[in-house]
Each structure stands twice: as C-alpha cells, then as structure tokens.
C-alpha cells in the first residue's frame, strides 16, 4: 500500500575511476531471461577474465585460468554490471515477489529505475551513457532505452546501445509451423558450421562460402519457402540440392523436413555419421550423446564446455574483493525463464512474437546522436548473425548508424581469443568515437 516502500534489492558491480565524472558509463547485463551478468563481467569486460579453451574444447575441472584483462574498456569508461531481479544476489523484498518483475514489460521498468537512481547517487547526469546487453539483452536493451528516454519520471537519453548476439525479434528465432523467418535466417550459420566441420564440398574460403549462403538464403531459399505448395517440383528439387550443398545435410534429410530443418535437428544430424552432436551457443563444439540415434542432442555441448569455469571465476573474484553474502549467487535461474511474462500471450496461446527492434529505430529518429553496435558469431545457433541482420533491416533501422560486426566464433564470441581481442577493440572505438 506504500508506493515508497522498497520493492526489490539490486546487486550490481561497479568499477569507477576517481574524479572521472565526465567518463562514459556502460551499464551491462546478460540475457536469459534469468541470467546474471557474470558472463560479460568475467568473460570480456571486467578487470579480470576467465580463459576457456579458444578452440572450443571442454573447460574440464578447476583450477581454471583467471587473468588480468589488459583490454578491458575500463581504460576508457566506467562499468556497471547489473543482475536483474531473481539473478545474482538481486531479490524482491518485503511483500513483493520476483514474479512482479519477470516480464518483457516489467523488467525494463525496474532496471530503468535502478539506472536513474545510480546516475543521481553518483552525480553522473552529464556523463555519456551506454547500454550493453547480450542475447535476451537484445530484448531488454531497446526497451530500456525507450523506458529511460520517455519514462514518466525523468527522461534520460542514451548515447548508444551495444547488443551482443541479440535476440531482439522472436519471429526470426522461434521455429513454429508456418513461420519461415528462422529457416532462412539460420541457414548461413548452418553453412558456417558445416564448413567448420568439413561437411561441405567447396574450395572457397569461409568468408566466400558464408556470403554465398546468405545470398542463396535471401534471394532463392526465402522466396521458395514463401511459395509453399505453389513451388514447382523442378524448383523445389533445385533448392533442396543447394540447401544440401550449403548445410552438409543429405538430400533425403532435407526432403523429409520439407526444406525446413530446425536448429535442434540440424545440431543432431550434421555429424550423426561420426557419432557427434554440435553445440547450440557455439557450434564449433561437438560431443557424443547417450543415444546416437535420437532426434535431438542430450544438452548444449557448448554450454557444458565453459559454464563451470565462469561460475568458478565469479565466485573466486567476489571472494578476492571481499564480497560476502549469506545467499546463493544465481548465475542462471530456470524458474525466472519459465515464469517470464510475454505480452503476446493470452490464456497460454501465442498471438505474435516479441519484437523490440522498432524501439531502436524510434531512438534514432528522436536522438540524432544515438548509435548502435551489434556483434554476432557465425557459429551461433541460438541467435545467428543473419537473423540479426534481417530483423535490423526489417524494422526501419537506419543502418548507416549501426556498426554490424561478425566474428568466427559463437554466441559468446569472446570465448574465442582473436574475437575477444577484436570485440574489445571495436567496443573501445565505438565509445571513443562519440
């Protein structure tokens, strides 16, 4: 009944330079929904980072390698890592429950309130401000920009939005019957994965092969899917041959799926003859399943390949800097994920797909200085590069004000050392070129 009573307690980690009130501030979070910020914190941005094998092999058991991050953007900007409610040590308090803040619309409102208070408490109203989000952060980030700049309390403009492997438009990511968007969006990442695992017959470089796959997907495959049963048998056969060429899948398999192979089936089928499945977050990873003959893999072998190292790293770092809490640090919470409210749902039925990309276009229209950086990995089978490219072009975004960067890596491209180096170089340039 008391609107001024505390509703939630945010846990966050800040790195601030002394007497640096004019320095840019980067507010960073991961995705899920239901994920804490440890992945960006300990993987690439923070002063200390965990090093997992760059070649997509398993991280094994501790001790793991935690090193100084000499490329951290801390040299140019202050960093604030935010754990959304229900993740990390952030919790609803008093009579409030986490479910009140778990939703597409609810989540950015409470995080925007946190940022407003942080800016006020730290006297940073005239500092350049950036939002950096990964994965579901591609949903949260654009909504947060709108919530900050047009909120009912105090409007706050943001200088830029940085999205890592963004999941900003679910139409391009969800494999539902009748939705062709993910099929032509995922195909180039299927092609890159098949190329990496030597399942394609080509003398071309990866870059050339990947570009060819995008052109095929956009100009031939996508239109063929739109034709549905109107497609001629001759054209369908031609499309299936090219699909097989780019993906490394057999013609029979492609035909059985009516040219619409979902990502889970692709991950299981590509290396089936070798007894492996490939990873979802990073398809360079491969491992065996309990049943080689199943339709889907047992788990995401790429997540299994690095999660332990990251969780160990955040707990080790917090212990080193004196963080002591009488509760569990929730690196990821499935309860948050499965309790998340989507505004397109009514009585359990989907009536549409969440899409926050129009918020990016809106920010561009009303803030002449607003700019965007998008990074993605060619081997990401969760939020592929071409899906991000498609939904940016499909929602009136001014691409002249977008830096779009592709990496020969996965969802967390910073697990790949050359991509780690280039990503941080580009982030620094993006901030400094304001």
Regions found by a protein language model. Name each.
Residues 73-74, 84, 101-119:
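Alpha/beta-hydrolase active-site loop
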Residues 227-382, 394:
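Alpha/beta-hydrolase fold catalytic core
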Residues 6-100:
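N-terminal cap/lid subdomain of alpha/beta-hydrolase-fold enzymes
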Residues 133-146:
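Glycine-rich nucleophile elbow surrounding the catalytic serine of serine-hydrolase chemistry
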Residues 124-136:
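Alpha/beta-hydrolase fold nucleophile elbow
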Residues 410-420:
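Catalytic histidine-centered segment of alpha/beta-hydrolase-like enzymes
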Residues 46-52, 145, 149-233, 237-242:
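A catalytic-pocket lid/entrance helix-loop region that shapes and gates access to the active site
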């Amino acid at each position: 009944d008391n609107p001024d009573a505390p509703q939630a307690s945010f846990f966050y980690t800040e790195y601030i330079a002394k007497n640096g009130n004019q320095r840019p501030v980067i507010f960073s979070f991961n995705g899920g929904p239901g994920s804490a910020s440890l992945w960006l914190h300990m993987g690439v941005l923070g002063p200390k980072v965990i090093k997992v094998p760059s070649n997509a092999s398993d991280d094994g058991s501790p001790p793991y390698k935690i090193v100084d991050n000499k490329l951290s953007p801390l040299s140019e900007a202050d960093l604030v890592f935010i754990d959304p409610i229900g993740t990390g040590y952030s919790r609803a308090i008093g009579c409030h429950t986490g479910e009140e803040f778990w939703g597409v619309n609810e989540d950015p409102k409470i995080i925007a309130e946190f940022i407003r208070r942080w800016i006020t408490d730290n006297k940073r109203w005239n500092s350049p401000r950036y939002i950096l989000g990964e994965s579901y952060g591609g949903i949260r980030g654009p909504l947060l920009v709108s919530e900050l700049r047009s909120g009912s309390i105090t409007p706050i403009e943001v200088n830029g939005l940085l999205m890592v492997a963004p999941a900003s438009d679910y139409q391009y990511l969800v494999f539902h019957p009748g939705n062709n968007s993910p099929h032509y969006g995922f195909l180039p990442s299927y092609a890159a994965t098949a190329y990496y695992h030597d399942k394609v017959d080509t003398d071309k470089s990866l870059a050339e092969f990947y570009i060819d796959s995008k052109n095929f997907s956009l100009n031939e495959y996508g239109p063929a899917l739109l034709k549905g049963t109107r497609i001629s048998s001759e054209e369908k056969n031609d499309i299936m041959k090219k699909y097989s060429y780019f993906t490394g899948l057999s013609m029979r398999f492609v035909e059985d799926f009516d040219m619409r192979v979902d990502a889970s089936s692709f991950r299981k089928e590509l290396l089936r003859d070798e007894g492996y499945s490939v990873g979802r977050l990073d398809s360079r990873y491969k491992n065996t399943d309990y049943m080689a003959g199943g339709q889907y893999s047992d788990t995401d072998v790429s997540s299994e390949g690095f999660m332990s190292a990251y969780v160990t790293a955040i707990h080790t770092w917090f212990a080193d800097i004196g963080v002591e809490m009488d509760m569990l640090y929730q690196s990821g919470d499935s309860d948050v994920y499965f309790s998340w409210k989507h505004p397109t749902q009514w009585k359990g039925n989907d009536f549409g797909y969440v899409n926050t990309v129009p918020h990016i276009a809106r920010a561009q229209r009303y803030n002449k200085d607003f700019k965007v950086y998008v990074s993605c990995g060619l081997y990401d089978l969760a939020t592929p590069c071409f899906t991000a490219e498609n939904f940016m072009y499909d929602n009136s975004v001014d691409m002249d004000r977008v830096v779009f960067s592709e990496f020969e890596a996965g969802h967390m491209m910073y697990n790949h050392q050359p991509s780690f180096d280039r990503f941080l170089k580009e982030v620094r340039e993006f901030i400094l070129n304001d």
